C-alpha cells in the first residue's frame, strides 16, 4: 500500500492510494474539529467521478464528519486496468471497494450512493450491513423494472460502443442531459480529462456498462431491503428521465426506517445542481437520533 497527497483544493484534498495492483484516486474533507463520528463514504455513478460530491462533502465536514469520495476503478483518475487484469463486474468492484476501505482503515461508516454504478454500493451495504451506520441513496435503480437507459446501454454495443466511449463529449452529453441543466466548464473540463488523457477511460466505461448485470443486481437489492433496518434516506430528483421515482417512494413507504426526500425539479444527477438543498437535509438526517 502506498499513499500520498497530490493536491489540496480549498478544504478538499485530492489523494492517491495503492491497494495491491490498483491505484485509487479519492477526494477527502476532514472535519474542522476532531470528533468520534464515523466517516461518510460517497460513491458516484457513471460516467461521473468523485468531483460530483464537491459541494456536499464540505457541508457534512462542517458538522464533524470526515468525508471520502473515491473514483471507482476504471473511472475518473483511478487506475484503468485492462479487462484481463480487472473484470469490471459488480463482484470485482465490491472486492476492490473492500480493499480501498481496508487501506484507509474504515470499518464503520455511513454510505452515500448515486446512479447506476451506485448499485454496487447498495450491494456492498446489504452484504455488510453491520458496517453501515446510515445509508443515503440519490437516484439509483431500486427495482427489477429499472433498465439501463439507451444513452448508456449503447456504450456496451460491440463496435458502436467502442467508438462512442472514446468521445470525450460523451461526458457532457450524459451529465448535462441527465441533470437537465448546464454544468460549468471548469467542472466539465475535469470530467472530460480522463477521456482526453487515455483511451483506457473509454475502454473501462465500455467494460463497466457491459458487466453491470442490472437484472441480477436488482433482484439482490430488492431481496436485501426486505429486512433492512439501518436508518436510510432517499433523495430523489423527480424529473429523472431514466429512472421512475415510484419504486423509490414504494420502498420508503414499505419500511419505517427509510425516509423519502423529493426534489421535483431535479433529474438524474441531483447533487450537481441541488447540492445545497440536499446537503441541508442530509445533515439533518445524519444528526437525527435513531
Regions found by a protein language model. Give the residues of each.
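Catalytic active-site module of serine/aspartate enzymes centered on a nucleophile-bearing elbow/loop
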Residues: 258-290
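N-terminal cap/lid segment of alpha/beta-hydrolase-fold proteins
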Residues: 4-23
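Conserved HGGG/HGGXW glycine-rich cap/lid loop of the alpha/beta-hydrolase fold
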Residues: 29-77
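Conserved serine/cysteine hydrolase catalytic core
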Residues: 201-253, 262
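Active-site loop/oxyanion-hole signature of alpha/beta-hydrolase fold enzymes
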Residues: 20, 27-30, 62, 69-113, ...
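Flexible "cap/lid" loop of the alpha/beta hydrolase fold
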Residues: 126, 133-163
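Glycine-rich nucleophile elbow surrounding the catalytic serine of serine-hydrolase chemistry
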Residues: 114-123
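Conserved alpha/beta-hydrolase catalytic His-Asp/Glu region
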Residues: 148, 165-226
Amino acid at each position: 500500500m502506498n499513499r500520498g497527497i497530490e493536491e489540496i483544493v480549498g478544504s478538499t484534498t485530492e489523494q492517491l492510494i495503492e491497494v495491491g495492483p490498483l491505484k485509487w484516486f479519492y477526494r477527502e474533507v476532514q472535519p474542522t474539529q476532531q470528533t468520534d463520528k464515523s466517516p461518510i463514504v460517497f460513491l458516484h455513478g457513471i460516467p461521473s467521478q468523485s468531483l460530483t460530491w464537491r459541494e456536499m462533502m464540505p457541508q457534512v465536514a462542517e458538522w464533524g464528519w470526515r468525508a471520502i469520495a473515491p473514483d471507482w476503478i476504471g473511472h475518473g483518475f483511478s487506475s484503468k486496468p485492462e479487462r484481463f487484469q480487472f473484470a469490471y463486474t459488480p463482484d470485482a468492484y465490491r472486492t476492490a471497494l473492500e480493499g480501498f476501505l481496508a487501506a484507509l482503515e474504515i470499518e464503520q461508516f455511513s454510505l452515500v450512493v448515486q446512479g447506476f454504478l451506485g448499485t454496487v454500493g447498495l450491494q456492498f451495504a446489504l452484504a455488510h450491513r453491520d458496517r453501515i451506520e446510515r445509508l443515503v441513496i440519490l437516484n439509483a435503480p431500486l427495482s427489477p423494472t429499472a433498465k439501463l437507459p439507451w444513452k448508456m446501454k449503447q456504450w456496451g454495443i460491440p463496435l458502436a460502443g467502442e467508438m462512442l466511449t472514446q468521445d470525450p463529449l460523451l461526458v457532457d452529453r450524459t451529465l448535462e442531459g441527465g441533470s437537465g441543466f448546464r454544468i460549468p466548464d471548469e467542472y466539465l473540463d475535469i470530467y472530460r480529462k480522463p477521456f482526453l488523457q487515455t483511451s483506457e477511460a473509454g475502454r473501462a466505461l465500455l467494460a463497466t456498462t457491459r458487466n453491470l448485470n442490472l437484472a441480477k443486481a436488482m433482484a439482490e437489492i430488492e431481496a436485501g431491503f426486505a429486512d433492512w433496518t439501518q436508518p436510510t434516506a432517499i433523495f430523489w430528483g423527480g424529473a429523472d428521465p431514466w429512472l421512475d421515482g415510484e419504486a423509490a417512494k414504494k420502498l420508503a413507504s414499505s419500511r419505517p426506517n427509510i425516509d423519502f426526500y423529493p426534489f421535483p425539479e431535479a433529474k438524474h444527477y441531483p447533487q450537481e445542481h441541488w447540492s445545497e438543498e440536499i446537503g441541508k437535509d442530509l445533515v439533518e438526517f445524519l444528526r437525527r437520533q435513531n
